[in-house]
Amino acid sequence: MTSSAVLNQHLIDPEICIRCNTCEASCPVGAITHDSNNYVVDAAKCNFCMACVPPCPTGSIDNWRTVPIVRAYSLEAQLGWEELPVELTADELSAGQSLANDASDGSPAQVATTAAGVSTPQAVSAPPNYGALCAPWSAAVPQVNVYGPSANDPDKTIATATVTGNVRVTQVGKQNDTHHLVLDFGTVPFPVLEGQSIGIIAPGLDAKGKPHHARQYSIASPRNGERAGYNNASLTIKRVLEDHEGNPVLGLASNFMCDLKVGETVQVIGPFGSSFLMPNHPHSNIVMICTGTGSAPMRAMTEWRRREQKAGRFEGGKLLLFFGARTQAELPYFGPLQSLPKEFIDIEFAYSREPGLSKRYVQDALRDRSADIGKLLNDPNTYFYVCGLKAMEEGVLLALKDIAEEVGLVWDEIGAHLKKDNRLHLETY
């Protein structure tokens, strides 16, 4: 059998995937897409660059099946999967070889695109990807997949946490309903770091009679707990009332979580994430850029740094926060943020729909502080974190590029250093 008719097809395991969108956001050629059921890889577009593999929090992206090219699994087939298909036998591969010879002139490109049901793809120029794939050198070592399908211990499939707090953190009476929830794990070890996330499994079954897929939420508390020394963690969750097109819909997990009462329990898996972690070395600076519930990891990092400085265990280092929302009323944690000392954290709010004010986005706020940001871009001890809706990512990167050039830096060189030194972290969805 000639290798030209065989494809080592890149696939995503639907049983392990937590639908966090990390793979789709990381793919530079648009080969990964999704529907309400699964995330899938287009065999006709995937160029095996592997950019999606390191950021995946669960390892569900790192799966492969050897198939005859004419039998490459289509997007339609993958979207309907509940588990990965078994490996083909040698006889099945041989039979596929015969089909390949009969169906085409033997061109791998032709049979691959025929199998995937698309026309021959045009060459795709991948845009530069400046996001870090690893944590800062001084970050704490994370534990991942302690609970869930990927757990090393088969007895640790799910952890149970008890709700000990649930408070709204956006203005009451407004449509944007965001909650701060505190989950207590009791005697169950559940180690998390700032920048990691967990998966929440909503109760009940889906339309197919299967347990619901876990929904991913970023940790909003420091590593030693929402209350220092306690085995608890907090989340920032917005109640989903409409889909991306603006159509009315009740988000399953978000509404379940926002409606929880103190004393009720939830099923948790994780933790996930090994790269979106904060630096811990003295004099390290952190620039945080976020919108909405993207503030969760920023709150965690800020509180850990505050506790460390208060205890005299951290020396120097700047904290800058660029926080965007449509209005002040929709901005989570507005009150507590106002009470933080200005010498501890430098905060810029950006409102795009505040009555009486001009539209201002986080990228505008960055440009307004170009002198400060320009210096920090060139400082090897400064780390940038971007978290929020995917739509903000391009605007933020363009702003950083403009600022770099404004202060006489070459963006391609600075961008390459940011990536190599793991100084620019992107977590958008």
Placement of each model-derived feature along the sequence:
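Short, charged beta-turn/beta-strand-edge "cap" motif at the junction between a beta-strand
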Residues: 204-207, 270-275
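Ferredoxin-reductase
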Residues: 148-153, 160-261
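A short, basic/flexible loop-to-alpha-helix module at the beginning of a structural domain
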Residues: 2-7, 272-281
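Reductase modules of NAD(P)H-dependent flavoproteins
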Residues: 124, 132-133, 140, 147-148, ...
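Short, compositionally biased
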Residues: 75-78, 209-227, 278-291
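Active-site beta-strand/loop microenvironment that shapes enzyme catalytic pockets
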Residues: 282, 286-307, 392
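Flanking helices and flexible, charged tails adjoining ferredoxin-like Fe-S electron-transfer domains
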Residues: 1-9, 45-130
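Cysteine-centered iron-sulfur cluster-binding motifs in ferredoxin-type domains/subunits
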Residues: 9-30, 40-59
